[in-house]
Amino acid sequence: MKAKDLRERTTEHLRELEKSLAAGLFEARFKNFTNRLNDTATIRKAKRDLARVKTILTQRARAEEKA
């Protein structure tokens, strides 16, 4: 997921995506713990995507405070 694409989405959609990514990250960590995860890079990708979404949400919240 690219930050440019995420910025085009609505805030509500980003919040839903944040919940989805957090659940996916939890599931990937659980699978890794039980040795059922084949591609451990999915954890890293999920963490970074979640961070991108949270960053954009924070930027929007701060922009609303200033306005």
From Swiss-Prot:
| GO process annotations (BP) | translation
Keyword Ribonucleoprotein attributed = yes
Q: List the keywords (alphabetical).
A: Ribonucleoprotein, Ribosomal protein
Q: Which organism is this protein's natural source?
A: Sorangium cellulosum (strain So ce56) (Polyangium cellulosum (strain So ce56))
Query: Pfam families, per this entry?
Result: Ribosomal_L29
UniProt-recorded Gene Ontology molecular function terms = structural constituent of ribosome
**How is this protein named in the record?**
Large ribosomal subunit protein uL29
| GO CC entries | ribonucleoprotein complex; ribosome
Could you name the domain of life of the organism this protein comes from?
A: Bacteria
UniProt KW Secreted keyword: no
Disulfide bridge positions per record: none
Q: Which family does it belong to?
A: Belongs to the universal ribosomal protein uL29 family.
What gene is this protein a product of? rpmC
Q: Which residues form a coiled coil?
A: none
